[in-house]
From Swiss-Prot:
Disulfide bonds join C78-C189, C206-C214. PANTHER family: SOMATOTROPIN, SOMATOTROPIN,PROLACTIN. It comes from the Eukaryota. The gene is GH1. Keywords: Disulfide bond, Hormone, Metal-binding, Phosphoprotein, Secreted, Signal, Zinc. This is Somatotropin. The keyword Zinc applies. One of its GO terms (biological process) is positive regulation of growth.
Amino acid sequence: MAAGSQATWLLIFALLCLPWPKEVRGFPAMPLSSLFGNAVLRAQHLHQLAADTYKEFERTYIPEGQRYSIHNTQTAFCFSETIPAPTDKEEAQQRSDVELLHFSLLLIQSWLGPVQFLSRVFTNSLVFGTSDRVYEKLKDLEEGIQALMRELEDGTPRAGQILKQTYDKFDTNLRSNDALLKNYGLLSCFRKDLHRTETYLRVMKCRRFVESSCAF
């Protein structure tokens, strides 16, 4: 790996390890642009982790000939599809920042319970070895989104919770074909939901702070 690229990833890792800033004497400890920047970095990291975990699980447990048919079954249905949230960048651009933050928070909170079982399911893989930290990473992103909501809502009452149903727990019985399919579907939804969250945050950041990285 090139020295410049390695230094960049080390900087990103260092930023991800930093806690969210606290307010001191009524003044924000970090500008809004930095709050958005940190949230985007954390969402990107989680989305990449979810994508890597999904690919590794698929490679390890799902025969290549079965993957296409499984993708088109109810196994791949995600609870997040039942809420009126944008499904892509173009739709997200039609929503307000406050709406996108609410949707992001709902998506993150729907996974806080299920991901606590990831480390019990995936114990013998280098990719899955970080799964016991996914919960902490999600909680950290949740805190960042809530900080942004406090900054942007400015006393406006919050909308009611839309997503009433959360996801099932991951099944630890990997010898069962049904359990494998269930986990495969959950990982697919986890990847999709984190991709949505990352997209929402990037759309908000780009339209508030015009930058070259807006083309994504």
